Amino acid sequence: MEARRLAILCSHLNPPGPNPTRDPTLRVSDCSSGSSGDGKVESSTLQNDCVFCKIIRGESPCLKLYEDDMCLCILDTNPLSHGHSLIIPKLHYPTLEETPPSVVAAMCSKVPLISNAIVKATGSDSFNLLVNNGAAAGQVIFHTHIHIIPRKERDCLWASESLRRHSLKLDKEASQLVSCVRRHLCSLPEEQLVQPS
């Protein structure tokens, strides 16, 4: 598992393909979020060894699809399908739990716009929206990001799609799970539970 993570990280650091200085479609991201007015991101908001932070600072190349003041969307350098893209916040948050709701909302608000363009451009039928949050879930780069993975009918991308699902048993175990989740939600500060109007 560790070797796989290292291989994926290396593929993000050294993407295969054209030399960025020769390919006019390859852009280096310029970062405006968290800036001090000169277009540079404050070092306290980014990590020196994070590949996504390097992209945001303009130190690593990327194929940029979209950018605004909160996030950018790039093509994944190790795609699961043609057009596999990543929406990345411009400030460094290692996991989804550590990412402020306003940043998550900004990223998610771009999904319809970006995914629609990707689906049309790739001739796909649909897409998966995915967040690998934590090592056990397959997160390799610890900078929050959302995957947009274009799909075509019968592409057999996920082996689990062929697995039969089991119906939820409405038993004591399920009731205990519901109670436990609700207890955890009730223990959160009220401002985390209030929905914006």
UniProtKB/Swiss-Prot annotation:
GO cellular component: peroxisome
Annotated substrate binding sites: H147
Primary enzyme class: hydrolase
Chain span(s) of sequence motif Histidine triad motif: 143-147
Region (Disordered) residue spans: 14-43
UniProt cross-references to SUPFAM superfamilies, sorted A to Z: HIT-like
Keyword match Hydrolase: yes
EC number: 3.6.2.1
Subcellular location: Peroxisome
Cytoplasm found in the keyword field: no
Pfam families: HIT
Alphabetized Gene3D superfamilies for the sequence: HIT-like (3.30.428.10)
Catalytic residues as annotated in Swiss-Prot or TrEMBL: H145
Domain of life: Eukaryota
Ranges of residues in domain HIT: 51-158
Name listed for the protein in its UniProt record: Adenylylsulfatase HINT3
Source lineage: Eukaryota, Viridiplantae, Streptophyta, Embryophyta, Tracheophyta
Gene: HINT3
